[in-house]
């Protein structure tokens, strides 16, 4: 018998590595904490920049809104005997000074200019930082808007007494630098432009308490549009307080929500009567 020899085949048996030599596939607690800390640092660096960019975008939109309002008024006036849309109540009272509401006649007129008053987030009648406006009040009826509007005031209260005074509201008599609308909130003492104690239901807002003193630092500024149709950002340092004075020296209407000491009030009242 012939012997048959088979070649020996040496096979290599793979053996699992020892546990202490295995590849690591997880972070240690220290490494995880380091990663979290890095993410937190990056977030702290990026979030303020993102917030600033968002605020800048809102300011730009607000500026565009006010510019549209100014252009719309300049379109309205030439077709209406050079008068701007009135900022007063629909009842025709000669003393009422309402700038934050639009009555049905004004709503119809602005709609014809493409400035539709509606309760939606893209409304041209409010700042993007006040998305709740405009608000419709069916009991009056009127729309509360998000801007202060100063155009077309046919009468105002005189600083030396509670009686009507003529107002140069024609566009041709106005200076281009006069503020037409502004992104601000005014302060009242329970009435809109009338002295305390007035009981007219169409003037008093019974559910509106007197505003308290402003807390914290003053704002950086605000957007304003002007009679010439332009609009720009105005730093707070360049603003001044617009106040309606009663005959007894009390304030009725405040442009900036800050309670001033009596000495300052007296000086401002004197300056108000001696421009």
Could you describe each region identified by the protein language model?
Residues 60-275:
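Short, well-structured segments within or immediately adjacent to enzyme catalytic domains
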Residues 7, 16, 35-42, 47-51, ...:
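N-terminal cationic amphipathic segment used for targeting or macromolecule association
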Residues 6-11, 19-20, 52-55, 63, ...:
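General helical secondary-structure elements
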Residues 19, 30, 36, 46, ...:
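Generic alpha-helix initiation/capping and coil-helix boundary signal
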Residues 3, 12-15, 44, 124, ...:
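Generic N-terminal simple sequence motifs
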Residues 24-64:
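Amphipathic alpha-helical segments typified by the pilin-like N-terminal helix
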Residues 4, 37, 44, 48-52, ...:
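Residue-level signal for well-ordered alpha-helical scaffold segments within enzymatic catalytic domains
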Residues 1-29:
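N-terminal leader/signal peptides at the extreme start of proteins
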